[in-house]
Amino acid sequence: MPWNSEHTNWFFKIETNLKSKDGKEVCLLEYNYDLNDKTVLSKWAKHFRNHYCFDSEIDFLRNGTGLSRKDFLVQLKFPTEARGFGSGIRSGDFSEILVADYLEYILGYWVPRTRYGNKTIRDESTKGTDLIGFKLYDENKTTKDVLKMFEVKAQYSGNKAKPRLQDAIDDSIKDDLRKAESLNAIKQRLFDKGKTEEALKVARFQNQVDMPYTSEFGVAALYSNDIYDEDVIINCDTSAHPYNSALFLIVIKGDDMMKLVHKLFEIAADES
């Protein structure tokens, strides 16, 4: 399998009493990546690339285009680096995948990777809930099983921090309404890839009335350190969220994050 988790070792939890305006605790993480660690970056780039196009499928998909693997990815699959909305889509995709990795490899959820490979327009974001993670305890389909819906927002440029955590909270309010469509999309993409067993895991969560489980919600904001502002975080308010008691708040920050975003896309293409 192409997946790898070594880059999640660069997460460091900052001990803090950070809370929202209404008293919800905020988990604060520093992402201390190392651009000199070529081994980890290479494994991460492969992991990242396979969200857009599996290495096992790229030669078939590029057949007829006259493009090399690198050019196929750069010209047809990856969001553009500078044109139009491309840079913003790059940062958004990167941030969602990084939070998915934290959710899966640090917090222990299963997060299907189906969101980016079937884009029709590469410089557009995929509709629906940003991330869905699952915990299944056994085959008995107990109420302990967990479905966690996550919204992710990022800001890696600008002179002033925007309320990205509040934006994620506001978007998360709609997640329960989008759940059925998002689950169906994940299940269908898994089935289309021949991953029937994984598709059936998703099916377990499609009828909460007859097969109850625990619903959780999460929101994440990611910033570059040069614009991160704690005051913006503590002014966010979750009180309007209908599932406030089941809401997890996380902020991830790191140095020059947009540089990292572009570097990862570059390595992913170069090493394809």
Report each predicted region and the residues it spans:
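Short, solvent-exposed loop/turn segments that connect beta-strands within catalytic domains
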Residues: 137-145
